[in-house]
Amino acid sequence: MSKRPTVLMILDGYGLNDKTEGNAVAQGKTPVMDKLMAECPFVKGNASGMAVGLPEGQMGNSEVGHLNMGAGRIVYQELTRITKEIEDGVFFENEALLKAIDNCKKNHSDLHLFGLLSDGGVHSHNTHMYALLELAKRNGIENVYLHAFLDGRDTPPSSGKEFVRAAMEKMEEIGVGQVATVMGRYYVMDRDNRWDRVQKAYEALVLGKGETAECGLCAVQQSYDKDETDEFVLPTVIVKDGKPVATVKEKDSVIFYNFRPDRAREITRAFCDDKFEGFERAKGFFPLTFIAFTEYDVTIPNKTVAFHKVEITNTFGEFLANNGLKQLRTAETEKYAHVTFFFNGGVEEPNEGEDRLLVNSPKVATYDLQPEMSAYQVCDGLVEAIRSDKYDVIIVNFANPDMVGHTGVEEAAIKAIEAVDECVGKVVDAIKEADGQMFICADHGNAEQLIDYDTKQPFTAHTINPVPFILVNYDEDYTLREGGCLADIAPTLIEMMGMTQPKEMTGQSLLKKR
């Protein structure tokens, strides 16, 4: 065996950008990363588009990034896969989707479309919603209601109005559908058990309770007038003659077209789980035909999944377990699922010999209020694990560049970058002390571009910029090759450990003899 432990450090949302304007990575004081990039083998890696199984030019994201890293191969994402099925026409024969249609026909009930209405491509894509309108039209379903969840994180903060406008035009063109509610993802797509937020969304959907507006566009505009951007639009019910256009009722069908699970779970559980305890449901549990685009959570009952995931076998974690090696995964709450569930190919169960260390994320409204988040605690746990000599491999994620980058607050993002730099320094020292080795990377860009260079507006989304690949304390005879992507990381780590990569991994090691 080689040096031990081998650490994979993921700096979430830490991209590289030649421009310094609006670039927290360039503006922060980062003596540690500067030194590593100057003195260690360092190249720029690809973390977006086809390199991670997304459509060309599509920004990467944390789920996709960790999936590719853990798989050691390019994993074609749901976005790419579903879009292809729409183009091929297979989409319109999908059994689960037709189950929703048949239920509406049988019970003369309504079809509700839930989902993040944007082209961000991280959680959903608006073209998938358009395909659902087309599906309803082809099957003669007339009562189709869109519940528009606004984005503003993976898209510009005030772009929601245009997405609603485009959706309304598409409904007009296809000849079916109307907007029934509008709400920000802050409420309906929480992932941190903030049930008070989810309850507001649920009550708008089921009771027609909340803010009211005469039309979808009016709902967005009245929020903008109160300085609420897309993400924070209060759940708003569209009313006609003083009554809600539509609410979700017993025997209706719901199709939730988000394909990424983490932020779809809570609201889905509120509808589908007969033993739900998050908050008091005004009407209690009632039966629906609820179709989830993907498997949000196997523990949520009473739903049907439309697109089952392609199994990924022999992930990096599985490979380590099969070789009897001990591994640790650690991160704070916001990214814990990424270093565990997503890194393991979408499998919840830990591998044999896989320990997990979760550090709670701070309970603040938005992370610009505490840009260091829980980085120092994650760092302390990591340093202790390195010194313990207990693990062969440790995988860690620092959430700050991404989570604080999403706020668009440049000053806070700079502080986040500086906090992470300090942590990287402590870990490098611990690695050298233990004679371990480390590979530093990022899963996608974010903090390196916080303004839209054309409009000069805040830019809160991920980017298509390259990310750093840095080799720390490995054999000096080696450097890194250019042109790699996230799928090449696991094969690199396996070679660093003196082992042979499994045939299922099609990525290629980045190590190159000088």
Task: Report each predicted region and the residues it spans.
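Feature captures the catalytic ectodomains and active-site-proximal regions of enzymes
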Residues: M1-R514
